[in-house]
């Protein structure tokens, strides 16, 4: 019997800032406007540097996670969406393990969302303190207590802004969710930048452009040996190359292809004779949720490992969790796990690394597939998309499955939904691993998130278009 945890935190949820639900139907044009405003605020916060930081030039321990967590180093968006996703991860695991009870009522759902927001704010403060005290912005002793507190307040306010922007879209004022919007924007921005960046970097081969496409034309124009120039443009190390770009496009195409896989269950109206329809169960039943939660798990493990490494360097247990080394070739300095649990849960750094340490590869594949399948399976129980919830929705709409009674509908849906959730999560994990091994820009997880989010927005657009009757009616 789980404890009634939601009732305990109810008084705290009442004092949290909240976006009110719209009192009227929001038109598509208004939704586009609110979505654009939300995105603009996020992008502005990504460019405003934190006041009071002494230095952010040290190796970045979260370089590999920033694209996925929509964060930008040394700015108000330092934490990105990490606190929201982490609070969602914790609440989901607690509900999935039946440690807390979440009923089917709207009241319980609202309390669950309130608890998630409360945890998000607590995690924001916790992460801000960890970032400051581990010396990411300079030695705390040199900065002084006042400046340290000021940085923590800035990060907390920025985290609160992200929470409210996400809630604004989720309540129906905009399209999709803030988390999805910020992730997709960050990943697409990274891909475009890595492809067309005009920034020059001094390497052992001379001065080169960071952007893969610009580097191709630059190498062909400046090198006398054109074949060697082409080889460099396609396979150069530590900088974006054309093979990375091709891999990115390939993964985009594969994920879009798999988005169309689904099983249509025949349903009919219990009220009107001859009214038939179908209920689609997609292969990616839980969409990108498994990969977002898996990223949150890994990023928090990185935070803990980095924090302990700074404070207790050389300790056996700390090294068992993760050993870190600085990498500076071809871009900003960043920390990368070279040992311990964090190393085995991170993707191989290059194709060569796959053959150098096959144990790392095997552990990484098992972790990705297992965690994505697990998160996908548990997510349906707390998100209102389990077989029992779907059967209840169909019953409310007075729809029944053809050839089945009301009582057997849950049993029939149970044959498909949990399997689709687990197998879909497994496929998401497998595609992410494939993208990592192919060297796709923005990491396999990032590409997968970008494609699934863009596809979600495409589906929203098509649905809105069908409701208002044509493209012209959407905007005019």
UniProtKB/Swiss-Prot annotation:
Cellular component GO terms held in the UniProt record: Sec61 translocon complex
Parts of the chain on the Cytoplasmic side: 1-33, 97-117, 166-172, 262-288, 376-420, 463-476
Location in the cell: Endoplasmic reticulum membrane
Lumenal side: 54-76, 139-144, 194-240, 310-354, 442-445
Primary localisation category: endoplasmic reticulum
Record key words, sorted: Endoplasmic reticulum, Membrane, Protein transport, Translocation, Transmembrane, Transmembrane helix, Transport
InterPro entries assigned to the protein according to its UniProt record, in alphabetical order: SecY/SEC61-alpha (IPR002208), SecY_CS (IPR030659), SecY_dom_sf (IPR023201), Translocon_Sec61/SecY_plug_dom (IPR019561)
Membrane-spanning ranges: 34-53, 77-96, 118-138, 145-165, 173-193, 241-261, 289-309, 355-375, 421-441, 446-462
BP-aspect Gene Ontology terms: post-translational protein targeting to membrane, translocation; SRP-dependent cotranslational protein targeting to membrane, translocation
GO MF annotations, alphabetized: protein transmembrane transporter activity; ribosome binding; signal sequence binding
One Pfam family per UniProt: Plug_translocon
Keyword Endoplasmic reticulum applies: yes
Record PROSITE patterns: SECY_1, SECY_2
Disulfide bond entries: none
Membrane topology term: Multi-pass membrane protein
NCBIfam families per record: 3a0501s007, PRK08568.1-5
Role: Component of SEC61 channel-forming translocon complex that mediates transport of signal peptide-containing precursor polypeptides across the endoplasmic reticulum (ER). Forms a ribosome receptor and a gated pore in the ER membrane, both functions required for cotranslational translocation of nascent polypeptides.
Quaternary state and interactors: The SEC61 channel-forming translocon complex consists of channel-forming core components SEC61A1, SEC61B and SEC61G and different auxiliary components such as SEC62 and SEC63.
Family assignment from sequence similarity: Belongs to the SecY/SEC61-alpha family.
Name of this protein: Protein transport protein Sec61 subunit alpha isoform 2
Gene: SEC61A2
């Amino acid at each position: 019997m789980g404890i009634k945890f939601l009732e305990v935190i109810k008084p705290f949820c009442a004092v949290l800032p909240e976006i009110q639900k719209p009192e009227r139907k929001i038109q598509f044009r208004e939704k586009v406007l609110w979505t654009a405003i939300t995105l603009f605020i996020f992008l502005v916060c990504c460019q405003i540097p934190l006041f009071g930081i002494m230095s952010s030039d040290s190796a970045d321990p979260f370089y590999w996670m920033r694209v996925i967590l929509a964060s930008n180093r040394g700015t108000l968006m330092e934490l990105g969406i990490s606190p929201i996703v982490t609070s969602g991860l914790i609440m989901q695991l607690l509900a999935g393990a039946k440690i807390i009870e979440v009923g089917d009522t709207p009241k319980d759902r609202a309390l669950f969302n309130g608890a998630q927001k409360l945890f998000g704010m607590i995690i924001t403060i916790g992460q801000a303190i960890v970032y400051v005290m581990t010396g990411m912005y300079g030695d705390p002793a040199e900065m002084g207590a006042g400046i340290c507190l000021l940085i923590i307040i800035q990060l907390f306010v920025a985290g609160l802004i992200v929470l409210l922007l996400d809630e604004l879209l989720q309540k129906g004022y905009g399209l999709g969710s803030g988390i999805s919007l910020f992730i997709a924007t960050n990943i697409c921005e990274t891909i475009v930048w890595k492809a067309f960046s005009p920034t020059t970097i001094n390497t052992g081969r001379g001065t080169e452009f960071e952007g893969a496409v610009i580097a191709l034309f630059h190498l062909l124009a400046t090198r006398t040996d054109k074949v060697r120039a082409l080889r460099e443009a396609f396979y150069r190390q530590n900088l974006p190359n054309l093979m990375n770009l091709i891999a990115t496009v390939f993964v985009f195409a594969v994920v879009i292809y798999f988005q169309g896989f689904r099983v249509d269950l025949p349903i009919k109206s219990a009220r009107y004779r001859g009214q038939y329809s179908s209920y689609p169960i997609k292969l990616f039943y839980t969409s990108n949720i498994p990969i977002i939660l898996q990223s949150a798990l890994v990023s928090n493990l990185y935070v803990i490992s980095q924090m302990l490494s700074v404070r207790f360097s050389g300790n056996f247990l700390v090294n068992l969790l993760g050993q870190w080394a600085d990498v500076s070739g071809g871009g900003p300095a960043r920390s990368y796990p070279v040992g311990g649990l964090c190393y085995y849960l991170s993707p191989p750094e290059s194709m060569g690394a796959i053959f150098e340490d096959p144990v790392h590869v095997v552990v990484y594949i098992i972790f990705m597939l297992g965690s994505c399948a697990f998160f996908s399976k548990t997510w349906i129980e707390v998100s209102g998309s389990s077989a029992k919830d779907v059967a209840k929705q169909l019953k409310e709409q007075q729809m029944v499955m053809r050839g089945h009674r009301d009582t057997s509908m849950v049993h029939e849906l149970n044959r498909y939904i949990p399997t689709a959730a687990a197998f879909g999560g497994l496929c998401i994990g497998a595609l992410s691993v494939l993208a990592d091994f192919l060297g796709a820009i923005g990491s396999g997880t990032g590409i997968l998130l970008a494609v699934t989010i863009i596809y979600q927005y495409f589906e929203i657009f098509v649905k809105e278009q069908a409701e208002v009757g044509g493209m012209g009616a959407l905007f005019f």
